[in-house]
Amino acid sequence: MQKFGGVVIPMQQSLDKEELKKITYLIGTADGICAMQKLPVKEPFDKKTEGFLNEVSKILMADKRVKIYSDVMTFAFWIRKANIEQLKRRFKRKDNDICLGKGLAFHIAPSNVPVNFAFSLVVGLLTGNSNIVRVPSKEFGQVKIIVEAMQKALLKPEYREINSYIALIRYERDRQINNVLSKMSDIRVIWGGDSTIEELRHSAIPPRCTEITFADRYSLAVIDADVYLGIKEKDRVAENFYNDTYFSDQNACTSPRVIIWTGKKKEEAKQVFWEKLYTLVEQKYVFQPIKAINKLTSAC
């Protein structure tokens, strides 16, 4: 916010609001975003926040659509009351000092991992902050289901105050919008790798703003052939590998790009592993034309 001699210049506020009107709001409003800077911070693991997340979990688990999205089911399980209490015990400070949130957190979620935005939001809420989260611009089914569950939970009278602490937004790449949201922030969380970080760094943040970035990184898997052949849950291993790799079309940083085999019976283990994975891929994986184009572009 620009000031001159201690007086706020309203022209800049007006320009900022015009930029905010370009945004599509899934939860929240332009006025709500402007008001976030004045919201009081909360203590970590605020009871109302915990209750809200548990309510979202219940709604998701009762939604039949969730059965086809293992990542949404994982999220619903993660935010249930029992797990939040476990996280709370891990977070508890031994010195008994009072902890408070820092303020307004601006999250830029990755475009290729549908549910990441929700995990980032939950961490922001549980640490006592108000949150503006840019969700993927692509219309993922998982995003729709989670947003609808949150909207439903926020309609309950006991959780309406949480509404002020959440803005889920969608907009195409726009540096002016990034500028407005960044200069409001007390925390900026950038997912999406090196190129996203480089672009967001063109948008200045306040001197006291904390920035958390997730740069490019790659994963590999190491499989002990002898141990693998000795376990009964080979179908479960194939399912987990599929979820980590094919579910995000190998775009997530946790998706293995290399598999290293160890042990004496490597060839036998490879044959069993790949056959089970092939059966699963044939049943579940849809190779869309846009995926082929993206892979070809990356290869070139």
What are these regions (language model features)?
Residues M1-G103:
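N-terminal Rossmann-like NAD(P)+-binding subdomain of aldehyde/semialdehyde dehydrogenases
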Residues V56-K64, L154, E158, A204, ...:
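Structural signal for hydrophobic packing residues in well-ordered secondary-structure cores
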Residues K88-A153:
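Conserved small-residue-rich beta-alpha loop and adjacent elements
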Residues S111, S137, D226, G263-K264:
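Residue-level signal for short, function-critical loop segments
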Residues N112-V113, S195-I197, E267:
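Glycine-rich nucleotide phosphate-binding loop and flanking beta-alpha elements
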Residues G141-E148, L155, R160-S164, Y171:
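Glycine- and small hydrophobic-enriched segments that form the cores of compact globular domains
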Residues Y159-V258, G263:
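Conserved NAD(P)+-binding/catalytic subdomain of aldehyde/semialdehyde dehydrogenases
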Residues D249-S255, I260-C300:
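NAD(P)-dependent aldehyde/semialdehyde dehydrogenase
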